[in-house]
Design a protein with these regions (language model features):
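Short beta-strand/loop motif that positions the catalytic acidic residue
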Residues: 48-49, 54-57
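Short, conserved loop/helix-junction motifs that constitute active-site signature segments
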Residues: 46-49, 75-77
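C-terminal alpha-helix
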Residues: 103-114
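Alpha/beta-hydrolase
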Residues: 1-44
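Catalytic histidine-centered segment of alpha/beta-hydrolase-like enzymes
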Residues: 87-101
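Active-site-adjacent alpha-helix of alpha/beta-hydrolase-fold enzymes
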Residues: 62-80
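General small-molecule cofactor/ligand-binding pocket signal
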Residues: 83
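Conserved alpha/beta-hydrolase "acid-adjacent" motif
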Residues: 37-40, 57, 62-68
Length: 115
């Protein structure tokens, strides 16, 4: 059974596992797969307000559909921010890491920094 059945997920987890977590095993419990199938955060996105929310969305995400992420942004109530990055789901952690981490840092400083 495969929990995240995309080529980029397989590449990310196997390559990252070798480099950063050499004892990691490519295994998942049936309960985790069951919980993953029930994971629908879009159903709760309106309840985040009035807390600020930032969505960093990959333009070509096949793991978490880009269209679904944009729909979530549209459903979210203000205050909300959206950034779209080039690439797929895992590029925010590698190829676009400088940009995604800067965006996240700036958002956190703006909303969680000293007042």
């Amino acid at each position: 059974m495969c929990a995240l059945p995309t080529a980029d997920a397989y590449e990310w987890f196997t390559e990252t596992g070798k480099k950063r977590a050499p004892t990691w095993k490519n295994e998942v419990t049936l309960r985790s797969v069951e919980y993953l199938s029930m994971y629908e955060p879009i159903n709760f996105i309106r309840s985040v307000s009035p807390k600020p929310i930032m969505l960093i969305v990959a333009q070509n995400d096949v793991l978490t559909s880009t269209d679904l992420a944009l729909e979530a942004y549209e459903r979210a109530l203000p205050p909300k921010e959206l950034e779209i990055l080039l690439g797929g789901h895992f590029d925010a952690y590698v190829r676009e890491f400088e940009k995604s981490s800067r965006i996240a840092r700036d958002f956190f400083l703006q909303h969680l920094g000293k007042k």
